[in-house]
Regions:
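Charged, structured surface patches that assemble and position nucleic-acid processing machinery
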Residues: 50-62
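Short alpha-helical segments that sit at the start of domains
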Residues: 69-99
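Short, charged, surface-exposed secondary-structure boundary motifs
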Residues: 63-67
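A structural signal for short, well-ordered beta-strand segments and their strand-loop junctions
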Residues: 33, 54-55, 140, 147
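Loop-centered beta-sheet repeat module
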Residues: 95-157
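Short, amphipathic alpha-helical interaction segments positioned at domain boundaries
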Residues: 80-85, 152-170
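Membrane-interface helix-loop-helix junctions at boundaries between adjacent transmembrane segments
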Residues: 58, 85-87, 114
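DNA-contacting interfaces and partner/effector-binding or oligomerization modules
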Residues: 1-48
Length: 170
């Protein structure tokens, strides 16, 4: 007998999958995640924790009951729908200032008010950025503020977008 426990989500973030992994009961069979799109980082978290996944782009990874499936590298068929916040773009000056401040001391626990005053922006802008950082498991919300928990991954993701060149044609 072979049981598969599937979790279907409209949107998935690394923080979401980490919570699912914590809650799952391994004795109840193999767990899989199904979502419209699963990022490379989320996929890696799934694989590292033995959780299968399938997305609408055709990316998948599944190991269970003598079955092995793996397909990677397919692009997101609807990228604009999945990425509503462009925090890393060069045009996101405020986000860039906040991120630079966070990287000044990644061991520190940051308060929204302090960050907003330090970079001269609204608390709402800082809060919006922190929400995205928490969803992606780069920052953790603590009782007394926010702490960067995965600076390497955050910096890598930021550098991917920040390094893109704009192409202008006339």
């Amino acid at each position: 007998e072979f049981h598969i426990n599937a979790c279907f989500l409209n949107r998935v973030f690394p923080s979401t999958i980490m919570k699912l992994i914590e809650k799952r009961d391994k004795s109840q069979g193999v767990s899989i995640l199904v979502a419209p799109y699963i990022s490379e980082r989320t996929a890696q978290i799934c694989e590292d924790n033995g959780m299968g996944y399938f997305d609408y782009a055709g990316n998948c990874w599944f190991v269970g009951h003598s079955i092995y499936l793996s397909e990677k590298g397919n692009k997101n068929p609807r990228p604009k729908e999945q990425r509503s916040v462009f925090i890393f773009e060069k045009t996101s000056v405020v986000s860039s200032c906040i991120l630079r401040e966070l990287f000044a001391d990644v061991t520190k626990i940051w308060k929204l008010k302090y960050l907003s005053e330090k970079v001269n922006c609204s608390i709402g802008q800082v809060s919006k950025l922190m929400k995205v950082l928490v969803e992606n498991a780069w920052v953790e919300k603590m009782p007394d503020g926010y702490k960067v928990i995965d600076p390497e991954s955050l910096l890598l993701e930021w550098s991917k977008d920040y390094g893109k060149k704009e192409i202008t044609s006339y």
